[in-house]
Every structure is written in C-alpha cells, then in structure tokens.
C-alpha cells in the first residue's frame, strides 16, 4: 500500500512570487526612463523633481503635493566621429487634476557638439505639479512629453512618453512660461 500523505507535495507558490517580483522590477526599470537609439545618438529621457515643497496633511486628502518636475535628457554619441552642434526641441503636456484643459509648454535648448562616446545631460521643461496623495491617483497632475533632437535642421532622433502625444497636443492650450529648473 502506498502512503500518499507521507510524500511532500511540491508547492509552486514561492516560485510564482519570485517570478512576479522579477517581472515587477523589470517593468519598473523600463517605465522609469524612455530610451531611443537612432542615427548614432542615444536619447534617454526621465522625469526628475527639481524642487519639492510637499506638505504632510492629516486631513481628508492626505499629503499635498507642490513640486517642480522637469525632464532630464541624457544624449550620447554612439558613433566614432564627432557630432555637430544641434538643438533639442521639447514639449510637455500638463493635465491638471482640477482643470479640464490640457496645457502645453514648449521650448528649445542648444546641444553642444559631442565627441565619440561623449554624454551630455540637459534638464528642462520645469512644470509645477500639484495634487493630493494617499487616496487616489486622480488627484495628481499628470505630464506627457515629446523631445526631438535636430542637427543642421534635420531631425536626428525623436522620443515621446506616449504614442498618443500628437493627438493630445492638438487639443492643448499653449503656454510659454515653463519654469527654468534650478540645476
């Protein structure tokens, strides 16, 4: 007679948990920064907080957000020759949690000539982010962005945070007063 209760059963739960943690880490790392490579340039863009004046609340909504968020672009020359000077054109869409219209801020930054394998970082497009945390993501301002690198008037590389950026930008209200980050 075989005793089926004596043998230990295989428990797949720890492996599933481990796999979920690995997948969550991979998605978190890829969502943190958007990277593109084209025409000998690598463009990596991430959001960065340059000023933070959040207040801890004990009221109904939780903590109140009040920060300046900007874009940080790392541009690397992947080719074996020097890249000429260029310009970085950017646009940031800001959807306020308490406002129906989407605002668009635009600007242009100079890009210095890059030697082979040289990296330069630019911080631009500062916008005020407000809202409340603790109960719902719906009470926080949201941003989307698009960045284009041009050399000699020709588009070299373009990156955006969402595929729907162009259609969202068509309906946005134009603003030219994006804040200059303090970096």
Please place each PLM-identified region on the residue numbering.
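Short, positively charged and aromatic/hydrophobic N-terminal segments
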Residues: 3, 10-11
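Sec-dependent signal peptide recognition
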Residues: 16-24
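Short, solvent-exposed, Trp/other aromatic-anchored flexible loops in extracytoplasmic proteins
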Residues: 105-161, 168
């Amino acid at each position: 007679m075989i005793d089926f209760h004596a043998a230990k059963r295989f428990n797949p739960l720890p492996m599933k948990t481990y796999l979920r943690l690995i997948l969550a880490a991979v998605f978190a790392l890829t969502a943190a920064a958007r990277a593109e490579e084209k025409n000998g340039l690598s463009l990596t863009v991430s959001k960065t907080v340059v000023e933070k004046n959040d207040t801890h609340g004990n009221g109904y909504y939780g903590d109140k957000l009040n920060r300046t968020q900007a874009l940080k672009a790392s541009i690397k020359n992947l080719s074996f020759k020097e890249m000429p000077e260029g310009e970085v054109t950017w646009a940031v869409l800001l959807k306020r949690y308490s406002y129906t219209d989407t605002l668009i801020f635009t600007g242009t930054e100079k890009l210095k000539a890059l030697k082979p394998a040289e990296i330069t970082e630019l911080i631009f497009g500062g916008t005020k982010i407000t809202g409340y945390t603790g109960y719902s993501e719906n009470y926080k301002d949201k941003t989307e962005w698009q960045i284009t690198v041009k050399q000699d008037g020709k588009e070299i590389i373009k990156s955006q945070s969402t595929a729907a950026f162009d259609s969202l930008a068509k309906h946005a209200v134009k603003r030219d007063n994006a804040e200059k980050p303090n970096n």
